[in-house]
Structure formats: structure tokens, C-alpha cells
Regions:
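Short, hydrophobic beta-strand segments that form beta-sheet elements in well-ordered domains
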Residues: 20-28, 107-110
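C-terminal catalytic/acceptor-binding lobe
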Residues: 1-8, 12, 33, 160-238
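Short, Asp-centered acidic motifs that coordinate Mg2+ and/or phosphate
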Residues: 80, 107-108, 184
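Active-site-proximal specificity loops/subdomain of glycosyltransferases
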Residues: 23-79
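Short, solvent-exposed loop/turn segments at secondary-structure junctions
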Residues: 28-32, 47-48, 87-89, 114-117, ...
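Conserved catalytic core of nucleotide-sugar-dependent glycosyltransferases
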Residues: 58-61, 68-69, 73, 88-175
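Short beta-strand-to-loop acidic/aromatic patch adjacent to the donor-nucleotide binding site
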Residues: 78-90
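Short loop->beta transition adjacent to catalytic acidic/histidine clusters or analogous donor-positioning motifs
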Residues: 7, 11-24, 79
Length: 238
């Protein structure tokens, strides 16, 4: 999914005509990852979840959300930041839409994705053909995984040691952008699960939820970390 995500962002950036968009990736210092231009890397992250939470096994190097955002904050002077999970693709008008919403007075935005099929008419969706997804309705997804916020708001956010990769990082992030903004807007918040989206802006290929399989110690620990900061993530859809 990541090649599709990357190319969709490049395509959307190239079709943006009402604002300047810089694309950044963030990686751990041990990761051997390359990104095509115009993507740039922030400084490498120096730690991950098991470096700060002793109970976690050293199997998954999941970064802390505050470290990711701090790295972006230092790398960019942009007035507004957009964070998406690494497997979330965007539509061609994505950045234009966000720019219009900001100009209309919103200072934070959450966009719920649509889950798209892995195959269409016998074709497996990949980086060469993913735009055929844009005529699909997809399926409703309740999770929060795309956020827009002002750079000054980040300085007020409290994440503790919550890390990415498993819930409830999305609920915690949503809680924080709502608390630190003056005019919040939520796209695709509600609706008939079988009906069309309010606006198709982001997508995910498939609906796999690997973090649900077996007993997930990372999910359990992330819940504990969120509760330490009194995040009401359990009620974040209300």
C-alpha cells in the first residue's frame, strides 16, 4: 500500500493550485528506506516504543507520535501540518480541499478514510492503476487517521508515550487537535455504512486489521499510555 500512498500524494501535490505543499517522510535511524522526489526526510528518529516502555518486547520499532510530529516541526516552517498514516492514500483534490477549508476559517480538520477493494474487475490494485479506485464508493471506516492542524497547536498537544501502529493513537490525536484548535471540522464523521461518503478524500486499500489478531500487547500498552494522560479516546466518535 505504501507505493500507492506515496504516488497519490505526489499526484495530488502536482494538481494543487491554491497553496504550497511540501511532502515529508519520517523514519527510524535503523530503517533503510528511500522516497522519491519531491519527498524529503526529516531527521531520523532516535528511539521507539520499547525504548521508553520497558514492558514491550523489542520486536516492533513503533515510533512515538510526539517524536514524529516533533521531527516534522523542526524540519518545516509550514503554518499548517497534515499527518496521515503511511497506508492512507489521497485523492487528486485533497490538498486543494484542505486549503479551501483553512481559508474558510477552520484551523483543524479530521478526515475519515474509505476502505477500497484490493481487486477491481480482476485487476489487483497497485501503483500503476490505483486511480480506478476514485470511481468507487468504498466502505465507511470509523477510525481517525488523517489530521490537519496549525503548527502552534502542536506546542500545546499532550501525547505522553502513545505510539503509532495500533489503537488508540487515532483517538488520542483526534482528542488533541480538538482541544488545541478554535474551529474544528470533521469530514466523513458519520453516515450510512453502505452509503456514499460526504466527500471522498482519503482511502485505504483493503480493510485488514492485523492489530486485532491474537492478544496484542502493543495495543494493550498503548491503551495504558493513553489513559495516563486522561485521553477520552474511548468516546472519540461522540
Amino acid at each position: 500500500a505504501q507505493p500507492v500512498t506515496i504516488q497519490s500524494m505526489i499526484n495530488a501535490r502536482n494538481k494543487t493550485d491554491n497553496c504550497k505543499v511540501d511532502l515529508f517522510g519520517v523514519k527510524n535511524k535503523f530503517d533503510k528506506v528511500k522516497l522519491p522526489s519531491p519527498f524529503k526526510f526529516t531527521n531520523d528518529l532516535e528511539r521507539c516504543c520499547y525504548d521508553v516502555i520497558d514492558s514491550l518486547p523489542k520486536k516492533k520499532s513503533l515510533p512515538l507520535i510526539k517524536d514524529i510530529l516533533s521531527s516534522l516541526y523542526r524540519a518545516s516552517s509550514a503554518e499548517y501540518f497534515i499527518y496521515t498514516n503511511s497506508d492512507i492514500g489521497v485523492l487528486p483534490d485533497f490538498y486543494n480541499f484542505i486549503s479551501e477549508k483553512i481559508k474558510s476559517g477552520f484551523d483543524s480538520i479530521c478526515i475519515n478514510r474509505r476502505d477500497m477493494p484490493k481487486h477491481i474487475s480482476g485487476q489487483e490494485i497497485d501503483v500503476s492503476n490505483f486511480e480506478i479506485l476514485f470511481s468507487e464508493l468504498g466502505k465507511y471506516h470509523m477510525g481517525a487517521d488523517c489530521f490537519v492542524f496549525h503548527r502552534d497547536a502542536f506546542k500545546k498537544m499532550i501525547f505522553g508515550n502513545v505510539f503509532v501502529g495500533v489503537p488508540p493513537v487515532g483517538g488520542v490525536f483526534l482528542d488533541q487537535i480538538r482541544k488545541t484548535s478554535n474551529n474544528f471540522h470533521w469530514v466523513n464523521r458519520k453516515g450510512d455504512k453502505q452509503g456514499p461518503p460526504e466527500r471522498l478524500l482519503t482511502f485505504h486499500i483493503g480493510s485488514d486489521r492485523n492489530w486485532l489478531k491474537n492478544e496484542n500487547i502493543y495495543w494493550t500498552e498503548n491503551n495504558k499510555q493513553a489513559k495516563k494522560n486522561n485521553h477520552p479516546f474511548e468516546n472519540h466518535l461522540k
